[in-house]
Amino acid sequence: MTSRTRGALLAVLLAVLATGCGISPSGPARAGAPASGVQRPGDEDRSVRLYFSGPYGIRAVTRPVARPLTPEQALDLLLEGPTRAEKERGLTSEVPPMEGLLTVTATTGAVDLVVPGTVGTGELDVTAISQLACTAAHADVPGDRPATEVDIRVHEDLTRSREPWTVRCGPEGDAVPVMR
């Protein structure tokens, strides 16, 4: 290859590289609207997280609220069941009807749930306990603990006389026993 051929080849190669570098002769392009759906820094989160059963396990849904809800208020919403849109996504509730029977008391870093029935006997199953525990843990519990560190003390058969058992909401929305 002669130096003349090499020079011509180099000129063609540089011309090809220069045209493919992505610099447009028309100037900057418009980017469109700013990102949306992201909470602005400093804005208060005005939503509540409820847990329902779905085709692939426990699923969290977020609903807008005017102010933070106590665990009792969040559980009242859970007891109403999924909305029409949530049902269309395949979400259901394994929590049996218990309006007026569920007692909820929140203290610093903990929530006491007094539930009707006994878990594992057909009256309440593990999915229902997960729904109740995780919904309560993600509500406005005193003490500012992360939801995964809130103790949910479950009292069965509408009594407080028996020793409760404690669970926490796991990262996947399932109730995890606390061993002490």
Region roles according to the model:
Residues 1-180:
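Bimodal "functional hotspot" detector
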